[in-house]
Amino acid sequence: MEGRPPPEGRPPPRPRTGRAPRGRRRAVFAAVLHWSHITHLFENDRHFSHLSTLEREMAFRTEMGLYYSYFKTIVEAPSFLNGVWMIMNDKLTEYPLVINTLKRFNLYPEVILASWYRIYTKIMDLIGIQTKICWTVTRGEGLSPIESCEGLGDPACFYVAVIFILNGLMMALFFIYGTYLSGSRLGGLVTVLCFFFNHGECTRVMWTPPLRESFSYPFLVLQMLLVTHILRATKLYRGSLIALCISNVFFMLPWQFAQFVLLTQIASLFAVYVVGYIDICKLRKIIYIHMISLALCFVLMFGNSMLLTSYYASSLVIIWGILAMKPHFLKINVSELSLWVIQGCFWLFGTVILKYLTSKIFGIADDAHIGNLLTSKFFSYKDFDTLLYTCAAEFDFMEKETPLRYTKTLLLPVVLVVFVAIVRKIISDMWGVLAKQQTHVRKHQFDHGELVYHALQLLAYTALGILIMRLKLFLTPHMCVMASLICSRQLFGWLFCKVHPGAIVFAILAAMSIQGSANLQTQWNIVGEFSNLPQEELIEWIKYSTKPDAVFAGAMPTMASVKLSALRPIVNHPHYEDAGLRARTKIVYSMYSRKAAEEVKRELIKLKVNYYILEESWCVRRSKPGCSMPEIWDVEDPANAGKTPLCNLLVKDSKPHFTTVFQNSVYKVLEVVKE
């Protein structure tokens, strides 16, 4: 039959253009659109292309500046390997300690980007292509002119550009994800448009590019897409499992918090298994992949024991044990529901107990503040570290306005409709099973476990987002993915038989676009130009008026800038996830307590501090009742409550224990008088 000519009078069949190429083009378009959007917002907000090198570094505030400083170290080192050695034997970040910052701060993104930058500049130099253009910018108002360079040859521009490209590609993944989950390209369109319409609730990469989530989150999207594929597939292929392992590693390596997200995923998958939507073989393979990726991260992070003592690691071990004990569970003569409860309790209490034991055995307390933070959300628990977190808006409960913003763009109503449809399916599936009294009656698995998994993951992200506002950055994008299921024939086939799905989807998108376009316009209207003259004066004074080995202490955000731009040793910094660093910061912040100046000076001398950068605003500012620094110290040090805060006294007169050596409208540098 092959090669047979078509019958007379009938034209030859037209070659069929597959849906895949069209889908790929749309995914690429979504990627380019998001890259352009976040690049435009970042430039509009900072006028980054016209800033000097120092201004660009100051624009990376708090922990952003800390992370970027290690990229700068490797880029400016005599060789790449020398730069890596320097960050692995760092003497500036927690003086006088020598620490492996690659192990402590999840700096693989900076290592990789620095290597790419060095390769890029060498190749461009070799073939004679100019990589940056520099010019002099006149600032006016009596300020000195500055040199500003633009192009990928500038380290800061290269660093930011790669981050934006990665997050542009993430939007292509969202289109593919929504398409695959819903079974319709319309689903991919819904996901992408929901993300854009709720952009300010979905990401902050355009305002804070160097944060760990900017590197890590795109790989979580890929990882969840792979999990969806594995749950849906009738046959597991080795390639899918290897891809899942790699995406796990790429998600965990840049971000310490990744383990908590993966904990919610493992818990959701375990629940999906318990109620019968995936078989034991599939879950066991997923657990093995997670264990392998965790072990790889442990090795690549130079034996970072915080990974092994995490709730995530404990949960993996407990679930593996439950799966191994399945024959014993089936021998228990109880109802199906009772068996679910038994396995759930075994997982919950087993995970908590194993986590406690491993932390005690390894002597790890680095993540103790996470438990205290969660405790403070439900009870009246307070301590110094917890208050530093909860007094910051991003660690407070979700704003009351957030659900309203979701509702205005119709994201919340659409997701609720999808969620209710999934719950109806679950109830329908479970009805017959729960009516039985014995556990051995069910011989088959339910269909569409990936839908149940996404519903459970939505609940987990909702809990995280409500408890800690910053974590809505997981919730909102997942809601956008869930919204794609409004196009799913598995859930709404009964409706699509009566009404064309395109008509329903485009009607919903048209309604969404009313508030969505207003949200986008609000973002586009943000126009600013970065300037921080007081900090610029401070950095310039430090660079030219202090010795290269002078040791500084002060507020965490300022210390990151001192290390990055002045290259001076510091004793504390914004990466607060280490128990030792939290203890150091408490000593440094005692300057804002009501303790005696002599006592504070004595502790600073023990840390070998030469200069303290005092900021009066830290003494008086108050984000909400009980959140000024003196009030936080009243919880930690009630014996001195009622006394005048030390910072207020030192603002007026720093003698005799300190000497004022520099002062401007924001900063006052105190030299510690040695005894």
Curated annotation (Swiss-Prot):
The main enzyme category here is: transferase
Query: Is Transmembrane helix there in the keyword field?
Result: yes
Q: Pathway, per UniProt?
A: Protein modification; protein glycosylation
Gene Ontology BP terms: protein glycosylation
Coarsely, its chief localization is: endoplasmic reticulum
List its EC numbers. Answer: 2.4.1.-
Q: Give one GO term, molecular function aspect.
A: mannosyltransferase activity
Q: Which UniProt keywords apply?
A: Endoplasmic reticulum, Glycosyltransferase, Membrane, Transferase, Transmembrane, Transmembrane helix
Where found in the cell?
Endoplasmic reticulum membrane
For this entry, the protein name equals Protein C-mannosyl-transferase DPY19L1
